[in-house]
Amino acid sequence: MASPSCLWLLAVALLPWTCAARALHHLDPPAPLPLVIWHGMGDSCCNPLSMGAIKKMVEKKIPGIYVLSLEIGKTLMEDVENSFFLNVNSQVTTVCQTLAKDPKLQQGYNAMGFSQGGQFLRAVAQRCPSPPMINLISVGGQHQGVFGLPRCPGESSHICDFIRKTLNAGAYSKVVQERLVQAEYWHDPIKEDVYRNHSIFLADINQERGINESYKKNLMALKKFVMVKFLNDSIVDPVDSEWFGFYRSGQAKETIPLQETSLYTQDRLGLKEMDNAGQLVFLATEGDHLQLSEEWFYAHIIPFLG
């Protein structure tokens, strides 16, 4: 039989292990990865009927999550106006600075962009790898641009009337490129050379003028790149752009999928390699532009955020 002194020594020896086991048992589960949201044209960060509702839906399903809905400007009205008239490259630079300063994002974050916010957040992923973006979810984003005039119902309709006239007059003029957001992802398939040489945003992030290896490396670092396409979209033209497809070069009638584009076959962004590795996710839903049901959102989007 062991002596009392031996038992005492054994208890002392086991004490650290017992304390460690108790500490591990009481550790809180890891916090969910933060989420950064970028709204679309004519919207704002905190509209209770759009981004505000999305934020609440995410918080409902993922308790404790930190959600940053980006506000581009000092007021909600300025945020809306900037979605039409503030140079996209300037917006991306500002967002990169905001994310870099946010202590809650430094270990990584997921990103979800709505409509034009989808391609804007892709620019963030390509240009600003720190803090790291883990998953990018593009909801109706136009990654090959648009070649159709925007339709804006309601209060923004007069702005879109102005945009139509301006794009028709000269989408690739320097003054229009610098001051009109929608011109910066205007992609004319009939004038590919003009687009390639004068688009100050989309042609750059799609590697149309040359290969920036850091863009490719940074995009390929994503765990998942999710693209949501709206099958009855009446705003985005062509709708295939939501899955990185576009018009076949030289005309504006026949569209081709991503896999048939030169961007993919030449693998200028690493999309072919990502596709083969299962990093690209293509989702489709019925409905018009950005018309999502809660049930569909919970079933198909939340799994990439939890």
UniProtKB/Swiss-Prot annotation:
Signal peptide: 1-27
Major location (coarse): other
Catalytic activity: S-hexadecanoyl-L-cysteinyl-[protein] + H2O = L-cysteinyl-[protein] + hexadecanoate + H(+); hexadecanoyl-CoA + H2O = hexadecanoate + CoA + H(+); S-hexadecanoyl-N-acetylcysteamine + H2O = N-acetylcysteamine + hexadecanoate + H(+); S-hexadecanoyl-N-acetylcysteine methyl ester + H2O = N-acetylcysteine methyl ester + hexadecanoate + H(+)
One Pfam entry name: Palm_thioest
Activity regulation, per record: Palmitoylation reduces PPT1 enzymatic activity.
Disulfide cysteine pairs (residue numbers): C45-C46, C96-C128, C152-C160
Gene Ontology molecular function, alphabetical: long-chain fatty acyl-CoA hydrolase activity; palmitoyl-(protein) hydrolase activity; sulfatide binding
UniProt keyword Ribonucleoprotein, yes or no: no
Subcellular localization(s) per the UniProt record: Lysosome; Secreted; Golgi apparatus; Endoplasmic reticulum
Glycan-linked positions: N197, N212, N232
Principal EC category: hydrolase
Enzyme Commission number: 3.1.2.2, 3.1.2.22
UniProt protein name: Palmitoyl-protein thioesterase 1
Organism lineage: Eukaryota, Metazoa, Chordata, Craniata, Vertebrata
Gene: PPT1
